[in-house]
Structures are given as structure tokens and as C-alpha cells.
Curated annotation (Swiss-Prot):
GO terms for molecular function: 3,4-dihydroxy-2-butanone-4-phosphate synthase activity; magnesium ion binding; manganese ion binding. This is 3,4-dihydroxy-2-butanone 4-phosphate synthase. Binds 2 divalent metal cations per subunit. Magnesium or manganese. Its EC number is 4.1.99.12. Its cofactor is Mg(2+); Mn(2+). Mg(2+) 1 binds at residue 38. One of its GO terms (biological process) is riboflavin biosynthetic process.
Length: 222
């Protein structure tokens, strides 16, 4: 690390590096949103390696709406239409139609079935016919510019996977409290300590990417 960098930036870069190391090891990370935006934390795992126990954790401890963040190119290759033609969502979250694996699942609801659907969708050789609609996994289309274009969890997920050298796809779900309310920052850190997940913010990822651009480093690939 450059010792001349401001302390705050160094801290942000270190947080991202810890998260990338965890993702490379197939572990999860918690990404917090800006307090002035959605003000929530999402639990994120690499799509290429997500396990049944990890999926069960997402279903049990989070909102249950498990999303699969993918690039625009991947969404197009799977011929997934957007959920609505006119997106009136306040944050322009780009949902496509929901999906289910065409083979190898039963009702599609179980953790094992959802992992099968994710693995099917992100396979390099995946075809549109490999998926059925509707289903219990909700794909999200990331903007090409990542968090520098849209500072959302969808873009943060794809950016993190690329920065980690993984396939640019990840699963996420919003962290909730036992009473069903959204987890705040204190609950997020408590959950992090309990499960050993690194915590970082979308702002940290923005700072990391801007630092790469300033130094000319190649952190993202198509």
C-alpha cells in the first residue's frame, strides 16, 4: 500500500482487500448501503461456489428473496426479459423475470434447488432453455460501469467478483432481524462477528475502483 495515501482511503482499500480475500476463499461478505439510500446490508456469496449451507443461511437469516446479480451480457445470453418494461422503482433495481433450473430441481424452493438454479444460470455453457420461468431466484442486471455508474448492491456484487478474479456473478439477500425488520449497522456488525463475514460499504468499493483508475491498475475485466 502507498503510505502517502490518506488514512481514510487506506482503511477503505484494506476493507475491500479483506472482502476480496474472503470471496476468493468461497466465503461471504456483508456490503452496507449508504444511510441516505436503502440503508441496509446485503449478505453476498460468489455465485460460482455458493453452497447449500450458505444458501440456507441466506434464506434463514435474510429476507428470503435471493437475487442473482449478473452482467448485462450474461442476462442477454440467457434471454431473460426484464420483469417490467417501465421500471418505476425508486432505485431502478433491474429485476428480470424470476428463474428456476429446468432440470435437477423439485419445487425450486429448497436451498439445494436454489443452488442448482444459480449454478445452472451462471454456467459458461448455459442456454435459455436451461431455465424455466417463473422461479425462486431473482436475477438482477448490473450496469456496465459498476458502482461508478450506479452505487447499488447489484453493481457492488458484480464489481467485487470481478475484482476478486471470479466469475462476475454473485448471490445476495438483504440481512434482516429475527422480528423481520431490516438489520441496522449495529445488527450487521453483530452478525459479522457471529459468522466471521467481513463488512464493507458500497462507498468503500467506489473508493477502491477510483484508486485503481488513478493508479492505472487493471482491476476489472469484461
Amino acid at each position: 500500500m502507498n503510505q502517502m495515501l490518506p488514512e481514510q482511503l487506506l482503511n477503505q482499500l484494506n476493507l475491500v482487500e479483506k472482502a476480496l480475500a474472503a470471496l476468493r476463499n468461497g466465503q461471504g461478505v456483508l456490503v452496507a448501503d449508504d444511510p441516505g439510500r436503502e440503508n441496509e446490508a446485503d449478505l453476498i456469496f460468489p455465485a460460482e461456489s455458493v453452497t447449500i449451507p450458505q444458501m440456507a443461511l441466506l434464506i434463514r437469516e435474510c429476507s428470503g428473496i435471493v437475487c442473482l446479480c449478473m452482467t448485462d451480457g450474461k442476462i442477454r445470453s440467457l434471454e431473460l426479459p426484464m420483469m417490467v418494461e417501465n421500471n418505476t422503482s425508486g432505485f431502478q433495481t433491474a429485476f428480470t423475470v424470476s428463474i428456476e433450473a429446468a432440470e435437477g430441481v423439485t419445487t425450486g424452493v429448497s436451498a439445494a434447488d436454489r443452488v442448482k438454479t444459480v449454478r445452472t444460470a451462471v454456467s459458461e455453457n448455459a442456454r435459455p432453455s436451461d431455465l424455466r420461468h417463473p422461479g425462486h431466484i431473482f436475477p438482477l442486471r448490473a450496469r456496465p460501469g459498476g458502482v461508478l455508474e450506479r452505487p447499488g448492491h447489484t453493481e457492488a456484487t458484480v464489481d467485487l467478483m470481478r475484482l476478486a478474479g471470479l466469475s462476475p456473478a454473485g448471490v445476495l439477500c438483504e440481512l434482516t432481524n429475527p422480528d423481520g425488520s431490516m438489520a441496522g449497522i449495529e445488527e450487521t456488525f453483530a452478525f459479522s462477528v457471529q459468522h466471521g463475514f467481513p463488512v464493507l460499504s458500497i462507498g468503500d468499493i467506489v473508493a477502491y475502483r477510483k484508486s485503481l483508475l488513478q493508479t492505472g491498475s487493471q482491476g476489472l475485466s469484461a
